[in-house]
């Protein structure tokens, strides 16, 4: 097995998926950034959730807002619902794993807040319940999905935004999700604090 050849194949596959995403995603990423900035300007916050690698993405996004992205600026209110192991395990034990995010949203979410819901398949049951809880709390949802959008896509309201990666391969979807998250962070900073150029 030629490992370097395989590495080149993987890089090329990632580049091709990002090129396909470039053709379709910019309007949705822009709209998602506007939704998030509107919430932040109106004293709202952004909650985020996902499973596995998507949980890591939720935490990555939250940390970029709470700390900083590429410039010095004030901290922005963002909470990853994936980080409190005591809360997650108690909800999973006493109720079900499907409710680990929705119960937190019902407690923490307020009208005008935003939920960043991340699932490569769009079919994660606990993320679907999170979206339902966010709507109950009059929050706007930004969904990062892939494939056909799954069950998440059918739940979204007109004011929600879906950023659906045009791929069926989990790793490629995750790679574009991370790029989309970095785009959102950049656009949020530029809209709130101006361009650095």
Curated annotation (Swiss-Prot):
SIS domain span: 36-197
Residues at which substrate binds: 51-53, 64, 93-94, 119-121, 124, 174
Gene3D superfamilies assigned: Glucose-6-phosphate isomerase like protein, domain 1
Top-level EC class as recorded in UniProt: isomerase
SUPFAM superfamilies associated with the record: SIS domain
EC number: 5.3.1.28
Compartment list: Cytoplasm
Listed GO MF terms: carbohydrate derivative binding; D-sedoheptulose 7-phosphate isomerase activity; zinc ion binding
Positions contributing to Zn(2+) binding: 60, 64, 174, 182
Cofactor note: Binds 1 zinc ion per subunit.
Cofactors: Zn(2+)
One term under GO cellular component: cytoplasm
Pathway: Carbohydrate biosynthesis; D-glycero-D-manno-heptose 7-phosphate biosynthesis; D-glycero-alpha-D-manno-heptose 7-phosphate and D-glycero-beta-D-manno-heptose 7-phosphate from sedoheptulose 7-phosphate: step 1/1
GO biological process, one term: carbohydrate metabolic process
Catalytic reaction equation(s): 2 D-sedoheptulose 7-phosphate = D-glycero-alpha-D-manno-heptose 7-phosphate + D-glycero-beta-D-manno-heptose 7-phosphate
Keyword annotations: Carbohydrate metabolism, Cytoplasm, Isomerase, Metal-binding, Zinc
Keyword Metal-binding listed: yes
Protein task: Catalyzes the isomerization of sedoheptulose 7-phosphate in D-glycero-D-manno-heptose 7-phosphate.
Family indicated by similarity: Belongs to the SIS family. GmhA subfamily.
Subunit: Homotetramer.
Miscellaneous notes: The reaction produces a racemic mixture of D-glycero-alpha-D-manno-heptose 7-phosphate and D-glycero-beta-D-manno-heptose 7-phosphate.
Name by which UniProt lists this protein: Phosphoheptose isomerase
Organism: Pseudomonas paraeruginosa (strain DSM 24068 / PA7) (Pseudomonas aeruginosa (strain PA7))
